[in-house]
Amino acid sequence: IQQLCQDLPWIKCIIVKKRNGISDIQKRGVIVYGDEPDRKIIENGTWYAIDLLLNRDASFYIDTRTLRSWAMQNLAGKKVLNTFAYTGSLGVAALAGGAVKVLQMDRNDGFLEIARRSYGLNNFKTSRQDFLAEDFFPAVGKLKRTGNDFDCVFLDPPFFSSTDKGVVDLEHGFQRLINKVRPLIRHNGWLVSINNAIYVSGRDYLSSLEALCADGYLSIDEILPVPDDFTGYENPRSGSQPADPAPFNHSTKIVIMKVKKKMNS
C-alpha cells in the first residue's frame, strides 16, 4: 500500500473487496488506507452519487458511459423507464439531457436511494412517484394494466436473478425480458437492450435480437461500444474472453432498438 501511494500520490483512500470473502462486509469492501471515500463523481457535466461500500461493485458502471452520453443527446422531452435501475445513472443522464419524466425501477430501495442523492446533486425535481421499488415482473405488469407508456425503456438486467415473481437469465431468457417491456414503448420509441453476460457471445446475442426483429416491429438502430479505456483487455476483439464479444468490443453488449406499433386502420 505504501508503494502504491508513493506511485499514485493523489490517492486518498484504498478499499479492498474480497470476491470470496467470508462476510458480506469483506465482499462490499473494507477501507485499508485513508479516510472515507468520495461520495460523488462528475461525468459530462452531470453529478452522480456513489457509495463504494454499498455493494460488491463500485455502485457506478463506467462501461455504460457512452450510453449515458446517448441518453443526454437523444432523450430531451421524452418519457423514460429505467428498469433494473440499480443506482439510476442512466435515468439521471436522461434527466440531464432534458427528459420530461423518468421512472426509476429497482426492487432494492437502498440502490434507488443513491439515485435520489444524484437528483439532489443536480437540483432535479423529485417525486416519490419517480422511484418504484418493486420486482420487475409485477411492476411491468402493473404499468401495462394502468396504461403507462414510454418513449424509451432501458433494459439492463443482472446476469441471473430468481425471485418468487420470476427469473432473469441473460444466457437463456433475454428475449422473454424484451417481449415483457415491448408493449410499454410508444411508436417510434427506443428499447435499449444491454446484455453483460460474459458467457454469451456477441454473435449469439445479436442473432437473438435479429430474430425478434423478424416481425418488422422491432429494428436494430445502433450498437454502442464500451469506452476503450474500460475494456481491460489488450485486444478486446480477439476472443480471449470466455465468449467472443464480436461484433461488440466488450462483453457489455449495448444495442439501441427502434420500436414500431401496429397502427389501427
Where are each of the predicted segments found?
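S-adenosylmethionine
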Residues: 135-214
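Conserved SAM-binding loop of SAM-dependent methyltransferases across substrates and taxa
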Residues: 87-100
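Conserved class I S-adenosyl-L-methionine
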Residues: 77-86
